[in-house]
Amino acid sequence: MKLIDTLLKLGNDVHINEKMKCHVSFKIGGPVRLFIIPYTVDMFLETLNVLDNVKILGNGTNVLPKDEYMDFNVISTEKLTGIFVENDTIICESGLSLKKLCLYAAKEGFSGFENAYGIPGSVGGAAYMNAGAFGWETAEMIEFVDVYDGKKVLRLDRTEMKFSYRNSIFKENEDLIILRVGFRIIKGDSYNIFSRMKQVMIKRVEKQPLEFPSAGSVFKRPRKGFYVGSAIEKIGLKGFRIGGAMISEKHAGFIINYNNAKSSDVKDMIELVKDKIYKNFGVKLETEIEIW
C-alpha cells in the first residue's frame, strides 16, 4: 500500500488488478498488478523512478496480453498528448495518437504524414517499432527522440536510432523509455494534405477489417515482394477460425477477435500460420505485434 500511496501522491491514476482487455485494441487480456496513468512527462519520470518490473503502454494497438494474471506493472502514456512547434520541429509527447499528429500537421500545412493517417497507434509506439503504411515509415520524419535511460533524459538524433523495417534501437534496448518525439516539418498545402489523407483512409476502410478488434497486421514482411496476407490466402486460411479468433476474410494479414477470443486462440493461430507458411513457402515469419 505504501507504493500505491506514493504513486497517488505523485498525481497518478492507479488501478489494481486492471484487466488489459480494457486498454488494448484486441479487447483481450487479463489483469496486471498495477495500471498507472501519469498526467505529465515529469510525473511519468517520477513514476518510473519508484517502480520496477514495468511495461509501457501507448495506445495499445500493437499488443496481445495473455489471459491470466500478469505479475508486472503497466504505465500508460494515454494522457501524455502535448504537441507544439519549436525551431521548425513538431514536438509530440509519446502518448499522442498518430491520428491527432496527422490532423495537427494537416491543419498547419505540414506535409509528410498523410500515409500515417489511420495508423491506430501513439507517437511513442510508432517510433518504438518504426510503424509504417503504404510505403511510408515513421523514421522518414523523425528528427530526434527524447528518452529516459533510467538515470537521465537524453536526446537521440535520427542517426542513433538504428531504424530498419519495423525495428529500432528502442526494441533492442528496452531500458530506453520514449518521452517525446521531434518530427521534421515539410511545408505543404492544407487542402491537398487533407485530400490525400481522405484517400488513404478510404483505402484503409476498403482493405482492412476495421470493424473488428485486432492489433493490425500481425506479421512482419519477411522479404521484399513477399506479401504475408496473399500467402495466407493462397494456402486457404482466409476465414479460418480457432476459438474466437479468425483470419480476416477482408485481409488475411489480420487476425481478428470476432467472438470473445482468448489470447491463447490468437497465439495458436499465429503458430499455425507460421507453420503453414514455412511448410508451403520455406519462409519463417516474425510477429509485428508485441506478445505479453
From Swiss-Prot:
GO terms for cellular component: cytosol. Belongs to the MurB family. Its main location: cytoplasm. Cell wall formation. Residues 27-188 form the FAD-binding PCMH-type domain. It is found in: Cytoplasm. InterPro entries: FAD-bd_PCMH, FAD-bd_PCMH-like_sf, FAD-bd_PCMH_sub1, FAD-bd_PCMH_sub2, MurB, MurB_C, MurB_C_sf, Oxid_FAD_bind_N. One of its GO terms (molecular function) is UDP-N-acetylmuramate dehydrogenase activity. It holds the Pfam family FAD_binding_4. This is UDP-N-acetylenolpyruvoylglucosamine reductase. It catalyses: UDP-N-acetyl-alpha-D-muramate + NADP(+) = UDP-N-acetyl-3-O-(1-carboxyvinyl)-alpha-D-glucosamine + NADPH + H(+). It comes from Thermosipho melanesiensis (strain DSM 12029 / CIP 104789 / BI429). It comes from the Bacteria. HAMAP family: MurB. Its cofactor is FAD.
